[in-house]
Amino acid sequence: LIRYNRLSTIPSSLANCSKLDEFNIEGNNVSQLPEGLLSSLVHLNTISLARNNFNSFPLGGPTQFTSVHSINMECNTIDKIPFSIFSLAKYLSKLNMRENALTSLPLDIGSWTALVELNLATNQLTIIPEDIKSLQNLEVLIMSNNQLKRIPPSLGQLRKLRHLDLEENKLDSLPQEIGYLRELTRLIVASNQLTQLPRSIGSLSNLTHLNVGENNLSSLPEDIGQLEKLEQLYINDNPNLDVLPYELALCTNLQIMSIENCPLRSLPQEIVAGGPSLVIQFLKVQGPFNLN
């Protein structure tokens, strides 16, 4: 095992290990690989260069990733994914570039069509390219802790998406098209600048986890009551959230609701002080739905 060994160089003789299917040098001090090393390991399935000192992709071009299914380069200082670097990576289903220094994504991102999981958290990305719509197999998209200001409507075309994490960005709105993500089970948009949620959020019929805490919401759409599978709702730390829709009581599977640091002035304060379960009970009793 080469992992966590304080190595700063990798011997080029490793190219002779032609049957190697996993190349894992996680947790060392490596900043570059011998040129073409990965290309010579033609049976590679998994590559992890995580937690090293790489500031660019290994030298060797697209042939390095021809047979690879999973690439993990998290926790380096890579500032660029080279154009066409994955042009031969027709099996690449998992790419983790978390905690790097990316400021943009390559123009050919739409060609990464085998991707199922894409983790770009904790970079300096400002834009999600429209072409992301071409990643029709994508199930997990994590772009938390970036500098995103808007979500392209084309994101709504990722019909297999199950997990979308956009926490800690600079979003002030979500597109109506987000309602097309019918397979979505987890939507995390906490710590943004959202002032409202689109009504189409009620179309996310498989959603179990919704986190919209730490935003600037003043209300929630009545359509939230259509989320029959919702189990966890985080609306904490929205300093302008005065009112909750009676429809929230229709979310009968709700188990966890976080409402800390929301004024909820339209509700009796003794109800709010009693916590989430009392709030839901109040909405049931006072609302027009006769849920008792």
Identify the function of each model-found stretch.
Residues 1-2, 23-25, 44-49, 68-73, ...:
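Conserved hydrophobic beta-strand positions in leucine-rich repeat
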Residues 5, 28, 49-52, 73-76, ...:
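Consensus "Asn ladder" position of solenoid repeat domains
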Residues 168, 180, 186, 191, ...:
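Structured C-terminal portions of repeat-based eukaryotic scaffold domains
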Residues 15-20, 39-44, 63-68, 87-92, ...:
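Leucine-rich repeat
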Residues 236-291:
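Leucine-rich solenoid repeat scaffolds
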Residues 1-56, 61:
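A generic tandem-repeat structural signature
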Residues 10-12, 33-36, 57-60, 81-84, ...:
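The feature encodes a structural signal of leucine-rich repeats
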